[in-house]
């Protein structure tokens, strides 16, 4: 199993939305509309691998929420140090680049992982109402390792 890298994210179509440090936005805060989008948010540190292709440190997913807090709620959990991962991110004084990837673009990282372009074209998409973000999160854990997350 390999570590997920920035190349994997770029190949899937992820976009950079900003940088955090200690659970706070560093160098500017993205608009709330961006932070409330459902999908996956990946944290990348330059310390997580070679500078040309750093490894992904952690991943978080956000579903449709009535409160529309989105990734802001994840940052709140980090600031409150509600898990070992949150305590590490809050205390290690490392800046993390935040990449966003909507669920509609997850195929190359989940069911299509490791397949060539032709096979990927015939691999099913995640359009089932029963295909949850939690299931996609588990597929990511099956296909990749993350620097700060064991699963």
From Swiss-Prot:
Q: Which InterPro entries match?
A: Phage_Ndd (IPR009514)
Biological process per Gene Ontology, one example term = symbiont-mediated suppression of host DNA replication
| Alphabetized GO MF terms | DNA binding
Please name one Pfam family that this protein belongs to: Phage_T4_Ndd
This protein's record includes keyword Thylakoid? no
Swiss-Prot/TrEMBL keywords: DNA-binding, Host-virus interaction, Inhibition of host DNA replication by virus, Modulation of host cell cycle by virus
Could you name the domain of life of the organism this protein comes from?
Viruses
Keyword DNA-binding (UniProt)? yes
> What's this protein's function?
Disorganizes the host nucleoid and inhibits replication, but without host DNA cleavage or degradation. Only the architecture of the nucleoid is affected. May act on the host chromosomal sequences that determine the structure of the nucleoid. Binds to dsDNA but not to ssDNA.
Protein's UniProt name: Nucleoid disruption protein
Which species is this UniProt entry from? Answer: Enterobacteria phage T4
By which gene is this protein encoded?
ndd
